[in-house]
Amino acid sequence: MDLVIERRLSSEVALIGQISRYIVAAGGKRLRPALLLLMCGALGYKGEQRFNLAAVVEFIHTATLLHDDVVDESTLRRGRETANEAFGNPASVLVGDFLYSRAFQMMVDAGDMRIMRTLAEATNVIAEGEVQQLMNMHDAGLSEDEYVRVIRSKTAKLFEASARLAALLALSSPEVEAACADYGQALGTAFQVIDDVLDYDGDVSEMGKNLGDDLREGKVTLPLIIAMQRGTEVERQTLQQAIETGDTSKMADILAIVQRTGALEATLATAAVQAQIAVDALSILPDTAYRQALMQLAAQLLNRRA
């Protein structure tokens, strides 16, 4: 897959390759392509097309990162400067556009309308989720349902598509395809919920970013929503002021409120429920080392610190 990524990043425009390689070289978990490849293994598909589509998924994800960092005005990702900080906003946005268009070129090469439909829908839903999150910024009254709706669009949808693509490549039955998609959606939901916990309780040295970055950017995530529900009137006022202004000068107080209300434990419990839903969805697959790896992946998400 890495060879495919390297080859398809090529462009006659030097800056495109420079920025693309900069963000790809930053590392990352490669979770979405790994999910696709593991699911292909679980379904017995060994064709070369799996590497092409794994690269497509990674390109789409990388494009969203480039655009997200511009929208969020982020300066640090994975412990080093974001592409927009290093190269400027215009270049980052345009290279993100290039990665989207290159991904669509590659999915056309697959020659399967179902694959193109799956990826086109996923890309559209991700964009809708990002816009909805933008509309929800600094909203202290955001509900848990509204929060879940956003993360299922902007994060879980690409996990879902990755798992579904494996089923399409393997020519699986509609029942198996649906189970794969269910696994991906639940896994992606758990991943984002844990990510939101880490903004208040993560290992800064491993994350490569600071605690409270989401709050500073105006993102209202599940730990804050639960803390708002459970806090005293004074605590709610403190949280509301921070949410509406993005002021993290009282971050120590905010962290104490989140801890005292049990918001982190409740959020982790939500992630655990989603991880179990993912594991349960795998019951339709034969018991192989690949299925075991997919089950382990769901369990490991709950214990990550970055």
Annotate each language-model stretch with its function.
Residues 1-306:
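All-alpha prenyltransferase/terpene-synthase fold signal
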